Structure formats: structure tokens, C-alpha cells
């Protein structure tokens, strides 16, 4: 079997948002294609295979074009049906160049996109400054913090719309945009349209030219509402995707913050949770939640003024704050521990010890089922290893040097209290636990 007849389905695929402004219409590759072409992400039977998916940047009508230099007609092995496999995941109204009129039809769609309008209710808008292509990389930070007026000629305007299955035309629109979840979210799957508890927040760029406005898709998130006894609900953020041309520019944070603000205003919602977050999303969420707690006059200032940040914590007060901020227990604990780290006196050995006990106890109780499967020495080793990883991550996030907390040398604060001394306290604090409704962690990498 010639290797030249095998193609990687991910690197062979190129996506382009046709009509997207300011240079964001360049082709980009998906992150995953295994939901479509199998775990090996390999397509057999073609040489020089190229899968081009052109998408109208507003309406998201797709045009599929599959080309190759040669097809292995001589083989007795099964040749993969490239178009047949991907069309199972495309919206029913997709176009394919296997039809002679498809290119012309797609050109008509792109022209008609000038009349496209976002579906649903606008819930937020924000601006970013226009950046020259040559300066884009160095200007990411300023883009994220721009507060230009929407009427400023140097402003780019972005809008977020909320939709449900009841929004006219949204079911059809969602069938087009859901493909991006498979291509950019590991483990994603399509959601069921007969489940009525879904809602969606979609991000667009709004472009004004010659007194006309057009809207161009950038990403979206889906949320699911769970009923909670007796008369409240939890909202679970299920899927979250920002397409590659718009990443690393603060748009993910803007979308997440908008969702959080919307949820927090709902009196009958107890908390916002996230379904199996990736490490990238954890960082995005941590940064935005932390920024909110550190806002002038906010939680951190209030807690510090009341001397509430030192371990052991006032559990009743902390829980009341969690309910007020509507963060899930694990996420609340993480950002709270970051705020505590920022206010920790690392020269105070007792403060350091109590902080370490608190963090380890939280890790232990959230992962007790997994840890109990290990020998006692392995438990202690894994707990210490995870603690060190967590604190290093926190230090990177908040800009605190944590070397003294982790130093195992004779003069390091971390060496003053051994695992034997802490073990009983860690496990004793583990008796009280939060239930997040999602069951135990799925893998050890999620210990923290």
C-alpha cells in the first residue's frame, strides 16, 4: 500500500469564511476531524487530496469542494467516500461542487449575505481598534481593552445575540454552525433539537460601509438549563467555540463575560457550570472570573477589609459569596484560592501551612473516589504533586512567585510541614464536600 494514497483528513481540510472582513477570510485548518473520518483521521484512496469548505460568513451556507490529483482505481481495498462522510454532518442546504451549478449558487448566496441579519436578541456589543496586519501580533492586548465608541471610524464593532429554538429561523442556522463544534472542540457531539432547554449566544462582527451594515459570524456558545429543587435552575455551558481568525484577541473573554452577566441577572438561577472544560477554556474562565473578583470595590477588596481571606476560611460567609456570584463550587474554590495567594504572607509559616491544608483538602474531597483507589503513600504523593501543579498554575495566573511555597530544601517554607503532619488534617477537612451534579472527574489530569 503506497503511503501516497493515504491523507491526513485534518491537514487536508481548509475552511474559509467568505466575505469576512479585515483579512479574516484567509483559509484555516480544523483542530479535529476524527468525528467525521475516524480516530486515525486518515483518508485512503487518493493522492493530493484537498477538502475545501467555503462558508458564507453571515448565513454560514457551506460550499464543499473535494479535489485530488489521482484516485487509486487499482486497489482492492475500500476507498473512502470523502464527500459522503462529511455531508452526514453538514446542514441539508449545503452546496457541493459535484453539482455543476454549485459555484454560481454559492456566489449568489455570498451576495445575498449583504442582507443577512443575526437571529435573536442583541444582548451586548463592544468595540476593538482596527489594527494593521503587520502590527496585529503586538497589539493583541490593546485590542482586548479597547473602549472606542462604535461611531469612531477606527473602531471595529462586535455584537452578541441570544437565541433559542423558538427564534424564527434559528434551527436552520444552528444546523450550519454546529459543524464548528466537531472541528474545534474535542469530544463534541451534536445536540438534540427536541430538547427545549437549550439557549445560544452567537458572536458577530458588524461592519458599516456606505451606510449599510453586514454581520459576520465569529463563534458561539450553547447552554443548557437544569431544574433544581425546589424552584431554581442551574445553567451548564456546554459548547464554546471562537474560530481561529478571531482567537487571542479577547473575543472569547467577551463572550464568556456576557454569558456570565446574563446568567447572574436571573433570580431563579443558582449557578453557571461548565461541561468538561478544556485546559484552554479553564484558563479563559479563570482569567475572567478572577478579573471580576479583583475589580475595585468588589469581592477581593471587601473580603480583605473584613479579614476573610486567610485560611481557615469562614465557610458560611464564603458560601454566601459563592451563591451571590453564582459560580460552581470547583470554579469558585479555584479563583478564591488565587485571590488568597495574592494576599498570602509567605513569610508567615502558619498562614502558608493553613493555605496549603485548605488547597489540599479541597483537592482531596473533590477526588476522593479516585485517590482512595491508591495506596496511602501514592495518595500522599499524588496529592502533593497536584498541589504543586495547582499553586504553580495560580502563580503564573496572578503573577506571584510561589517558589517558597514549594521549596523542599531545609530553608523553604514548603519544607517546614511534612506530609505526615498534614495528612490527618487534609482528610479530615475532606468530610464536607460540594456536589457539582456532574459525577467524579473523568481523568487524573483534572485532579485540581
Swiss-Prot record:
The active site is at residue 275. Residues 407-448 are annotated as: Disordered. Acetyl-CoA binds at residues 240-242, 247-253. The record marks 198 as: Interaction with histone H4 N-terminus. GO terms for biological process: DNA repair; subtelomeric heterochromatin formation. Its main location: cytoplasm. Belongs to the HAT1 family. PANTHER family: HISTONE ACETYLTRANSFERASE TYPE B CATALYTIC SUBUNIT (PTHR12046). This is Histone acetyltransferase type B catalytic subunit. It comes from Mycosarcoma maydis.
